[in-house]
């Protein structure tokens, strides 16, 4: 006679084991209709699963994230159902959920086309609209294997053979004639799976191993209702317009080419943005009392073996040989900073030492993962390492957190997700060291009143880390900043200081980056601003144009006055109509367009327009100079006249 405790604290007693769905029905017909699954004592269960003992129960509906994740997982099975009907010889591999959607890896003897995706999507909708029930059957390991052997599904058999214990009882989900295997839960009926879209096909190796067969990965998105799907697809369209690769080409910021995969060729305008970011961060380094250093690009293998990078990070390191010595190009800056710390005796009175570098790093990322500026092989980190005592950890981490929020707010990022990544399986150092490091970061977050999500096993091999992810205007998340606590690396490289009792102690090292990769951060803000950079970042801050040749000298005078004041200003004296010039520079997203006609010359003024078409009227040269200098100096996000 199970007693079921509901979220409001009320209890219901039943005479016999009862399913999640039947409990929902006992509460109300509306809840039963909305029930996708249940959370029994915190564990997700199918709506058909029986509750046999006293339990806490929450009904999962499409209104919550868990419900949406289950809908997406069931849409992956629906895709399997449809593709088996259209391509009976296809072999099914895996079909998990991902952020905003799902995918299914399939083995098919021909490449899928856009026409195939359209046909699959149509068949999925036809099947879903029959609103068939999804039937769950828990079977023995052998029965599951026999089922997939009879159906000619080698990948499912491999999963059973390699990943599932023979004593286990796998769940098979029946979608009419189609059968799939899954931990679940899944929707009880396909009426929940009407709002989806297949997005693309890509290649993917079985088990993610390049030695295995290349499969075809079909990506899809799924939502709880038509409105959510429509809004998501609209966001995707907007994201495509904002793609930093397109904007980067249109604005002539940078390019990449096959001869240097994952390496950026910065053009003048892109490099201007890069240098402005460096200048901005440098002002903050001074404000937060950092010293700036520069370490070598390449160091001997012996050093990387001492740090543990060679053993734990070797696959991502570029190496070279010279004069019978093996070197690695640095993937990160920390070992070099320890070498600088080690020069000269340090006392506890010298600590904390905050050491910053715009470090040029290289990582041998897989070619398939490279993506514009977002995933590169050569990048610059706004990196810093703080050498401190254990007593200083909390105050130093707190200062790092303050600096992170200070810098992000300048770019208009206010929605920041905080995550604490704990010890990975592959790591250096004793568990006691990791306990202290994780507790230290958690305490700093709590004392600063920050809510955070724990990411088990996602820390660096040498220490746990706080990650700061930016949520952009399209609701996408970008991981940028990190604060990592490291009790291991300084000791491995013999770093020490003289403590108050005259004993030698090993300093704690705090690794911190805020922008992260500057290349990636430029990609992020390019998409966030859609190329409409604020005036302080814009490569050209104002363009000065004449209407006829007679105004050329005045234009040059205006340009010289503004340029001499340190502003980035150009002239456009071409023999073109003024409307043509305005359209061209609007497309180039130049913040301000200054038009000089005879009336403006007579009054000693300029007519000012913004790139979004606002006519701001006329200003004297000195008035406009003061306005633009103030915007640049205070790093304002909006132009004059913008809300």
From Swiss-Prot:
- Indicate what this protein is called per its UniProt record: Threonine--tRNA ligase
PROSITE patterns for this protein: AA_TRNA_LIGASE_II, TGS
Q: What are its E.C. numbers?
A: 6.1.1.3
Subcellular location per the Swiss-Prot or TrEMBL entry? Cytoplasm
Q: How does it assemble?
A: Homodimer.
Which terms are listed as keywords in the entry?
Aminoacyl-tRNA synthetase, ATP-binding, Cytoplasm, Ligase, Metal-binding, Nucleotide-binding, Protein biosynthesis, RNA-binding, tRNA-binding, Zinc
A Pfam family annotated for this chain is tRNA_SAD
Q: Where is this region: Catalytic?
A: 243-534
* Functional note: Catalyzes the attachment of threonine to tRNA(Thr) in a two-step reaction: L-threonine is first activated by ATP to form Thr-AMP and then transferred to the acceptor end of tRNA(Thr). Also edits incorrectly charged L-seryl-tRNA(Thr).
Q: Name one GO molecular function term.
A: threonine-tRNA ligase activity
Q: Write down any Gene Ontology CC term.
A: cytosol
Q: Which family does it belong to?
A: Belongs to the class-II aminoacyl-tRNA synthetase family.
Q: Which organism is it from?
A: Pasteurella multocida (strain Pm70)
SUPFAM superfamilies for the chain? Class II aaRS ABD-related (SSF52954), Class II aaRS and biotin synthetases (SSF55681), TGS-like (SSF81271), ThrRS/AlaRS common domain (SSF55186)
Q: Which reaction equations make up its catalytic activity? A: tRNA(Thr) + L-threonine + ATP = L-threonyl-tRNA(Thr) + AMP + diphosphate + H(+)
The UniProt note on the cofactor reads as follows: Binds 1 zinc ion per subunit.
């Amino acid at each position: 006679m199970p007693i079921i405790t509901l979220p409001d604290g009320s209890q219901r007693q039943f005479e016999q084991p009862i399913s999640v769905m039947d409990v929902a029905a006992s509460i109300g017909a509306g809840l039963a209709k909305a029930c996708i699954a249940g959370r029994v004592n915190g564990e997700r269960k199918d709506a058909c699963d029986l509750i046999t003992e006293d339990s806490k129960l929450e009904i999962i509906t499409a209104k919550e994230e868990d419900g949406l994740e289950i809908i997406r997982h069931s849409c992956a099975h629906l895709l399997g159902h449809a593709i088996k009907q259209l391509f009976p010889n296809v072999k099914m591999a895996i079909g998990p959920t991902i952020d905003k959607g799902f995918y299914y890896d399939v083995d098919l003897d021909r490449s899928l086309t856009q026409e195939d995706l359209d046909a699959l999507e149509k068949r999925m909708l036809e099947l879903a609209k029959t609103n068939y029930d999804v039937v769950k059957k828990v079977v023995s390991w052998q029965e599951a294997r026999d089922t997939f052997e009879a159906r000619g599904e080698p990948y499912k058999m491999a999963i059973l053979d390699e990943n599932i214990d023979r004593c286990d009882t796998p769940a098979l989900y029946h979608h009419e004639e189609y059968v799939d295997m899954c931990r679940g839960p899944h929707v009880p009926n396909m009426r929940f799976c009407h709002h989806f879209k297949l997005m693309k096909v890509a290649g993917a190796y079985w088990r993610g191993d390049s030695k295995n067969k290349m499969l075809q990965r079909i990506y899809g998105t799924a939502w709880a209702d038509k409105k959510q799907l429509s809004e998501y697809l609209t966001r995707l369209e907007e994201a495509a317009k904002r793609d930093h690769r397109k904007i980067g080409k249109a604005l002539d910021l940078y390019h990449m080419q096959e001869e240097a995969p994952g390496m950026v060729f910065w053009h003048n305008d892109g490099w201007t943005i890069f240098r402005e970011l460096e200048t901005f961060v440098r002002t903050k380094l001074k404000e937060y009392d950092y010293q700036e250093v520069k370490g070598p690009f390449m160091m001997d293998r012996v050093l990387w073996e001492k740090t543990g990078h060679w053993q734990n990070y070797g696959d991502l390191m570029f190496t070279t040989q010279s004069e019978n010595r093996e070197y690695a190009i640095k993937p990160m800056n920390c070992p070099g900073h320890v070498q600088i710390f080690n020069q000269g005796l340090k006392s506890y009175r010298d600590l904390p030492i905050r050491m910053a570098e715009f470090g040029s790093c290289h990582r041998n990322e897989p070619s398939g993962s490279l993506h514009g500026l977002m995933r590169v092989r050569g990048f610059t980190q706004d990196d810093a390492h703080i050498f401190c005592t254990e007593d200083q950890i909390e105050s130093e981490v707190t200062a790092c957190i303050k600096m992170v929020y200070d810098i992000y707010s300048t770019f208009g990022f206010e929605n920041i997700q905080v995550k604490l990544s704990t010890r990975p399986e592959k790591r250096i150092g004793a568990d006691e060291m990791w306990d202290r490091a994780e507790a230290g970061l958690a305490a700093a977050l709590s004392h600063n009143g920050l809510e955070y999500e724990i990411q088990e096993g996602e820390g660096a091999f040498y220490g746990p880390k706080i990650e700061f992810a930016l949520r952009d205007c399209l609701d996408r998340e970008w991981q940028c900043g990190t604060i990592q606590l490291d009790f291991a690396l300084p000791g491995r490289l013999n770093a020490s200081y003289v403590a108050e009792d005259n004993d030698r102690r090993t300093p704690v090292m705090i690794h911190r980056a805020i922008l992260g990769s500057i290349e990636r951060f430029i990609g992020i803000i390019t998409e966030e601003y859609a190329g409409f950079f604020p005036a302080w970042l814009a490569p050209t801050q104002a363009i000065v144009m004449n209407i006829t040749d007679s105004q050329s000298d005045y234009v040059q005078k205006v340009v010289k006055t503004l340029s001499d004041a340190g502003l980035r200003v150009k002239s456009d004296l071409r023999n073109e109509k003024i409307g043509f010039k305005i359209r061209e520079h609007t497309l180039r997203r130049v913040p301000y367009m200054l038009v000089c006609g005879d009336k403006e010359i007579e009054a000693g003024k300029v007519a000012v327009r913004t790139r979004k078409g606002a006519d701001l009227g006329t200003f004297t040269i000195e008035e406009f100079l003061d306005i633009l200098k103030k915007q640049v100096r205070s790093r304002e996000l909006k132009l004059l006249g913008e809300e």
